């Protein structure tokens, strides 16, 4: 991965967008080529570096990718499902690689992403933290050893502004555990409990969601038996961990053939 990779960041004015700009500034092998905000945003025309608090970068926030076609190699997108689909379509038409950190896609949108990825390289992951991706590997081992005789619960917490629940990371945790145990998550997942629920079914995987304050992201998988329980927890204290992972993915994906990849592949954990 020699030389600099030029990245464009959409949703540049949001919390994650500003963190991505800061991460790009601090990474030796990354060059911020473009920063995009929605049409009509008051941030259009602002210097991206000044917005992110790293000083002037001479990268002016624009309101369309069409103005930046020649300025970047990889698009980084942590926006919203509908917007990400539009951006991916643009990347296919302009032969750009893409890193997607957006969560909350429905099944139809996932099918669209798979189809688009046949024409351009895409890394998509619900969480780009190195620690979270290692946690998924640990969950495989825990499920293999303890999953068939323990009650499995997944608890996640995020800031009050997060729009989807459970988080994409929590759902991925459930998918990893269910796949390891030969279960179908759509059939065994229980999302919240209320009222008289009856005795717990050992085959289920429970999900609990917290939305409060400025929690960046906390995820715990509990394997509970009589007399003991194992908890595997990841806590993010800053969005920078996700941004740094996205930069790592950008450097990696630009050298790949068309296809849909995840952070496990970026990190060599597969």
UniProtKB/Swiss-Prot annotation:
Pfam family name, one: DapB_C
GTP-binding in keyword set: no
EC number(s) reported in the record: 1.17.1.8
Major localization class: cytoplasm
Subcellular localization, as worded in the UniProt entry: Cytoplasm
Gene3D superfamilies noted in UniProt: Dihydrodipicolinate Reductase, domain 2, NAD(P)-binding Rossmann-like Domain
Domain of life assignment: Bacteria
Catalytic activity annotation: (S)-2,3,4,5-tetrahydrodipicolinate + NAD(+) + H2O = (2S,4S)-4-hydroxy-2,3,4,5-tetrahydrodipicolinate + NADH + H(+); (S)-2,3,4,5-tetrahydrodipicolinate + NADP(+) + H2O = (2S,4S)-4-hydroxy-2,3,4,5-tetrahydrodipicolinate + NADPH + H(+)
BP GO annotations: diaminopimelate biosynthetic process; lysine biosynthetic process via diaminopimelate
GO annotations of cellular component type: cytosol
Enzyme class: oxidoreductase
UniProt binding sites for (S)-2,3,4,5-tetrahydrodipicolinate: 159, 168-169
Binding site for NAD(+): 11-16, 37, 101-103, 125-128
Listed pathway(s): Amino-acid biosynthesis; L-lysine biosynthesis via DAP pathway; (S)-tetrahydrodipicolinate from L-aspartate: step 4/4
Recorded GO MF terms: 4-hydroxy-tetrahydrodipicolinate reductase; NAD binding; NADP binding; oxidoreductase activity, acting on CH or CH2 groups, NAD or NADP as acceptor
Active-site residues from the entry: 158, 162
Keywords: Amino-acid biosynthesis, Cytoplasm, Diaminopimelate biosynthesis, Lysine biosynthesis, NAD, NADP, Oxidoreductase
Residues bound to NADP(+): 38
Record-stated family: Belongs to the DapB family.
Function of the protein: Catalyzes the conversion of 4-hydroxy-tetrahydrodipicolinate (HTPA) to tetrahydrodipicolinate.
Protein name (database record): 4-hydroxy-tetrahydrodipicolinate reductase
Species of origin: Shewanella putrefaciens (strain CN-32 / ATCC BAA-453)
């Amino acid at each position: 991965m020699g030389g600099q990779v030029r990245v464009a960041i959409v949703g540049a004015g949001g919390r994650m967008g500003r963190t991505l700009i800061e991460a790009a500034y601090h990474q030796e092998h990354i060059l911020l080529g473009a920063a995009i905000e929605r049409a009509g945003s008051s941030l259009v025309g602002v210097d991206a570096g000044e917005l992110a608090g790293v000083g002037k970068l001479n990268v002016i926030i624009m309101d369309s990718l069409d103005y930046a076609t020649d300025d970047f190699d990889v698009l980084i997108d942590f926006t919203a499902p509908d917007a990400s689909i539009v951006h991916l379509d643009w990347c296919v038409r302009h032969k750009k690689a893409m890193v997607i950190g957006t969560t909350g896609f429905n099944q139809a949108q996932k099918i669209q992403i798979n189809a688009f990825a046949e024409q351009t390289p895409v890394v998509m992951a619900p969480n780009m933290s190195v620690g979270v991706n290692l946690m998924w590997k640990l969950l495989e081992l825990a499920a293999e050893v303890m999953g068939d005789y323990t009650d499995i619960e997944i608890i996640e917490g995020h800031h009050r502004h997060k729009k989807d629940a459970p988080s994409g990371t929590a759902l991925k945790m459930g998918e990893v555990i269910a796949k390891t145990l030969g279960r179908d998550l759509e059939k065994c997942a229980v999302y919240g409990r209320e009222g008289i629920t009856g005795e717990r079914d050992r085959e289920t995987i429970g999900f609990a969601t917290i939305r409060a304050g400025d929690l960046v992201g906390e995820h715990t998988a509990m394997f509970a038996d009589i007399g003991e329980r194992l908890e595997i927890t990841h806590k993010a204290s800053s969005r920078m961990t996700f941004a740094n992972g996205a930069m790592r993915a950008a450097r990696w994906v630009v050298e790949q053939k068309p296809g849909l990849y995840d952070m496990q592949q970026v990190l060599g954990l597969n």
